[in-house]
Amino acid sequence: MAFVLCPDLQREQCIPKMRRLLFAYLVLAAACTFGGHYAESQQSTDIRRVLDGRMLPGEEVATFERSETLYPSDVVRRGSVIRALPVADKRIESVLFQIGDKRYDLFDYLALNRVAGLLVLKDGKVALEDYELGAGPRTRWASFSMAKSVTSTLIGAALQDGLIDSLDDPVTRYVPALRGGVYDSVSIRNVLEMASGVRWDETYTDPNSDCRKLTDAQMSHQGGASLAYMKDLPRAAPPGSVWNYNSGETNVAGAVVEGATHLSLAAFLSQTLWSPLGMERDATWWTESPGGMGMGGAGVGATLRDYGRFGLFVLSDGVIADRHTVPEGWFQEAGRPHRIGGKSVDYGYLWWPMPPRDPIHAGAFEARGIFGQHLYINPSQKLVIVVLSARPKPTGSTVLDDTAFFAAVARALR
């Protein structure tokens, strides 16, 4: 007897569905064999202390190296083939840059910004690779909000695969748990632009902020707690009229990915990018509960080189094996400033456009995370820079300007 998985679909529609079902089965089998998530008992440092910036330097580094212990975490499986990163003919030994009336060099940047890992890829080749603070090539380092840009990319992949029809679809089409609440009139595009109009306070260090209340909900490790909190928030403005940075919004974006693909964020990332891109190590991604919904706003843990490989994928406009994994031009759209409520905002689809004050950054954009995490993409210079750091506070630490350093690197390699 033959099993017919999708008798109501044409063959070209059926094959992708069969592949997704097969992949989901393989992921489940791997989870049963190897452990698809990290147990709650493995958690150590309280995430609230992390957000408060109340950690000694050594404890902070140890925590960022084992970010999967902060929450239950799914494993993002790599494939069997590793993509080599060749060494560039032109290497960076040092670089000079100026901020105000003071001059700095590479060594100042590494030391003063508490950099654990720095990778520079020019034309797909390694121009600089450095590890500090005890980190090394196999160290998986916390992405924090750089994961938002990964989630954005997965939405692009789901759109390309026809699993999402349009960015103008309401998020509730893919996330039924949000129906009947403040997100009823919010589109996927609104969420990607952080322009839902939902009231939100992002203050990391304030226990009464929405950011911290969402953290408390996630710390309960109860499935559905995050979406329940988001659903009941009040409205501050009409959708699409005001920009407001909102990490909770990206958990909604992650839920859209999971609802559209019927896979976890980790499984869809593995299927779409991590395996075919030739990553050298499994990654991890936070979930709100063991085996539960992935956190679209934070929580990827990956090696320096694998973040770099992801950056090269972005630089290629999302092409893998001559196929667009995301819609053509997706990253140009995702990485440029958008107009919200008639005003230009320096934010794209969960990516940060670089400030235009230095022409070397023209068309460049980055993924950015608290404590000094950066994935800088400069298409015109064919340049990717990854910075993994352990700054003392989530934001506001006195450090050297990253954009000035990136500009100096770009000029040194022209």
Regions found by a protein language model. Give the residues of each.
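A short acidic/small-residue loop/turn micro-motif
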Residues: E132-G136, R140, R391-K393
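Active-site SXXK
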Residues: G124, W141-L167, V191, A253-V257, ...
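Active-site helix/loop module of the DD-peptidase/beta-lactamase fold
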Residues: A142, D161-R199, T203, D232, ...
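Active-site Gly/Thr loop motif
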Residues: M279-T284, F331-V384
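Active-site-proximal alpha-helical segments within enzyme catalytic domains
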Residues: E249-V256, G296-V319, Q373-A390
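Short, charged, amphipathic alpha-helices and their helix-cap/turn boundaries
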Residues: K125-D130, D169-R173, P207-P238, L263-D282
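N-terminal leader/targeting segments and the immediately adjacent pre-domain N-terminus
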Residues: Q10-I15, C32-G136, I164, E193, ...
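Bacterial N-terminal signal peptides
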Residues: A24-A31
